[in-house]
């Protein structure tokens, strides 16, 4: 089973830059998007053979998530069920026979960490939400988690120590998530692989110089460890400031 996650930084812009070619070529079983930057009714996307689920932010041109899946899910849920967290279209949960699929666009802590306090609350509520799902069946989480977990996960750890996405607080929350029974799938397969990133700033030729951050993830319940086959980061794919990340699962194991 092939799963892909991509922060497209605006799906309409990504379509103009070859999104559909990549989508069709990959033929994923489940394809998740973050930062769609759409309002309802703005885009009619024909994806033959896929069921589409979109969660929109109330604010125009902001945030938003989507999941395209070949198999129809048993249930669909938008958001966490907490009003203060559900206005920005950040979470979609699909239930399948053997697992839950959750895509998430984690709130950015912003310049000067203006939103760090909100981010900390979000992290705790989101982890609680995942652990509740896990009582029923294992969970696959994917998306832009807006944190580089360890120094290996970004090009310039020293100079970014207090910047959004690499604060001790954000990294600590990701550690808490893993400690609560989840696996960072890319590091599971490639614990020491350096200079593989999923996001590059548009400033200062960052992508050209590979001055990136690995902030896009597939994280799975430990109960799915035996089903993990491989993880990939498609750094060659352009069209956004992020690149797609991929997980292969064998659910028949």
Give residue ranges: language-model regions:
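N-terminal, active-site-proximal structural segment of metallo-dependent hydrolase catalytic domains
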Residues: 1-47, 57, 62-63, 149, ...
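Active-site-proximal beta-strand elements of phosphoester/diester hydrolases
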Residues: 1-9, 98-110, 142
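Active-site beta-strand/loop signature of hydrolases that rely on acidic residues for catalysis
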Residues: 7, 23-41, 101, 130-151, ...
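Structured beta-strand-rich core segments of catalytic domains in phosphoester-bond hydrolases
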Residues: 37, 42-109
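Metal-dependent phosphoesterases centered on the DNase I-like endonuclease/exonuclease/phosphatase
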Residues: 51, 125-211, 215
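Conserved beta strand-loop-helix elements of the APE1-like EEP
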Residues: 60-75, 196, 203-226
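Surface-exposed cleft-lining segments at the edges of enzyme active sites
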Residues: 81-82, 107-123, 158-162
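Surface polyanion/phosphate-binding segment centered on an Asp-His-Pro turn
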Residues: 232-253
């Amino acid at each position: 089973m092939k799963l892909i996650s991509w922060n497209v930084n605006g799906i309409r812009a990504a379509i103009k830059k070859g999104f559909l070619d990549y989508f069709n070529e990959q033929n994923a079983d489940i394809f998740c998007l973050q930062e769609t930057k759409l309002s309802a009714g703005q885009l009619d996307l024909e994806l033959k053979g896929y069921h589409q689920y979109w969660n929109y932010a109330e604010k125009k041109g902001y945030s938003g998530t989507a999941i395209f899946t070949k198999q129809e899910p048993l249930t669909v849920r938008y958001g966490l069920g907490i009003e203060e967290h559900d206005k920005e279209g950040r979470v979609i949960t699909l239930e399948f026979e053997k697992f839950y699929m959750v895509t998430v666009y984690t709130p950015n802590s912003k310049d000067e960490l203006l939103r760090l306090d909100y981010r900390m609350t979000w992290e705790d509520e989101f982890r609680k939400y995942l652990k509740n799902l896990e009582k029923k069946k294992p969970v696959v989480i994917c998306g832009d988690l807006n944190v580089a977990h360890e120094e290996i996960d970004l090009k310039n750890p020293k100079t970014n120590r207090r910047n959004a996405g690499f604060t001790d607080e954000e990294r600590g929350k990701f550690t808490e998530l893993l400690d609560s029974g989840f696996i960072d799938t890319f590091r599971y397969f490639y614990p020491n692989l350096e200079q593989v990133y999923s996001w590059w700033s548009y400033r200062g030729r960052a992508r050209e110089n590979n001055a990136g951050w690995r902030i896009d993830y597939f994280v799975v319940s430990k109960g799915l460890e035996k089903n993990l086959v491989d993880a990939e980061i498609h750094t060659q794919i352009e069209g956004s400031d992020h690149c797609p990340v991929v997980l292969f699962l064998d659910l028949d194991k």
